[in-house]
């Protein structure tokens, strides 16, 4: 192929193609088909421009080279074939002098008569397929597209072919000649198929023996041997109807392709039922902290020491009592468990030296709360093979739950700023190479936007709790260890602060497999009255344990302090992921970075500084019933972070399923918005798969509600 290209094309074109391939790091000795394609495209661009001039009256005329009028103004400016820097300089110059809109991608030509950029395409496939690909990539009404094929077909924007018929015929004849020359040398099939990315390597050797038998056995239905299947594939027309392709694959498939129009999609049906309940492993917006600033006490940094110091800052303790019972639990046991924690903490304080860890007495209330001796006895399967009615436990279907407003409030709160810094710069990692200067700048800007965010507090809280629980589960397997729920931050003045949210008591934890469960009881402080949204706290028993004096603009006021108690469980694998919640920072930073990259590629310079410092510009954050919500770049950073954090906090099979299935519908809707005229079959089945995941999970239900808002506004 390389020899053919050098013989068939003008040396200047060959040299330009070599430069282009070198610029993109491609080896023309290996990518010979690409080499031929670039030469062909260059030649078509030059032929398109040749002999076309504009006279003094501004009319387009065709003039042969030996004509004395060849000093007339060229009608077309050739952009293709120049190196990228020079090409963009030419484009910018044209835009400045003509007022044309700057294209996002480098076009091939500029037409001074029609005042428009032109994108030339040369395809070995169907012209309309290639045209759609070009149009979808460019997404600009200002760039004119003209596609030629090797079979003499052509397609142009609005059927406006720009050139006279004779000029176009010259191009088509040249393409047909190239095709014939390639075919004569046995190069055409490889060249034709390479545009579709087809592998042709199997044509070079014969499959025999065992591999041949395996090939014959693994054919799709209705094909008796490999030759038949090969013949079918070779003659396969890519522009055939999808229905036809499907029916050829299997007699069982009978799919009717339906056009997907603006009126086609319906909203996702959310389940009815009682409101959904809070299921996170720790309280989020309702959490209350007992804090100490600039901790310098003996044993500072040892969780139990820190916890006792924080507990001493509160003086409003009172005799606890139940204000919202757990419907199914033995509520007095929860009350007794809290009293036991207070008593055992008091015992520690009375000791001469405070221990580093505290194992609780195995009282009846804790045994009940932690499910001690409740698990059924495990019997080896071999010992019960002969039991005729051996069967798995009957399990009830989960009860359907409806979306409740509290989860949207939780998300909104997670996006807000607090008055403390929750991460230091080194949480994301230091530079390791000079090239990371821009990365450092982006990281610093991003950190500044999210370090005060409540979602970042949830990350650090989650990392601490999961690390402490996993350590205790491994180090004290048989003990009911008391684990303080602690976080650390800095005040806006830069002072260190240690916070206590409550306590966890861990149950027995002989965790052999990743999915083996350790039970724990969580006891968390809060100022939220559970009677305001009792459905949210279905899984909790809530006690009133004290009164807190709060300073406000009108003076001091007393508020009841509550303790939210519940039995919960987790596993090694869940704790492992919980310990790695800092990944959420990285994920949201990468999403922001892709936005900066998109902006930078359009402007052709790094836009990091402008992106973060232009406070007047707003960005789309998400959909709501009101429409598309906009906000500052900081709000975008915090929203993306909160989404990532909630995906971690509320991780579940329902979320996995909903994300995977709803994405398919999203892609079809996106194709419709891009005017790609998508078609679908079994759309009902897709809706079924999506709605199957909407059971009772609050975060999934909220995402489904957001998806419906998106559908409403995307298809207006």
UniProtKB/Swiss-Prot annotation:
Database matches in Pfam families: Flu_PA (PF00603)
Residue sites binding Mn(2+) 1 per the record: 41, 108, 119-120
Enzyme Commission numbers on file: 3.1.-.-
Disulfide bonds: none
Annotated binding of Mn(2+) 2, by residue: 80, 108
Short sequence motif Nuclear localization signal 1 (NLS1): positions: 124-139
GO function terms (MF aspect): endonuclease activity; metal ion binding; RNA binding
Cofactor(s) it depends on: Mn(2+)
Highest rank taxon of the organism: Viruses
Residue interval(s) of motif Nuclear localization signal 2 (NLS2): 184-247
Cofactor note: Binds 2 manganese ions per subunit.
Biological processes per GO annotation: cap snatching; DNA-templated transcription; symbiont-mediated suppression of host gene expression; symbiont-mediated suppression of host mRNA transcription via inhibition of RNA polymerase II activity; viral RNA genome replication; viral translational frameshifting
Record localization: Host cytoplasm; Host nucleus
Modifications the protein undergoes after translation, according to the UniProt entry: Phosphorylated on serines and threonines by host kinases, including human casein kinase II.
Similarity comment: family membership: Belongs to the influenza viruses PA family.
Subunit structure: Influenza RNA polymerase is composed of three subunits: PB1, PB2 and PA. Interacts (via C-terminus) with PB1 (via N-terminus).
Protein name in the entry: Polymerase acidic protein
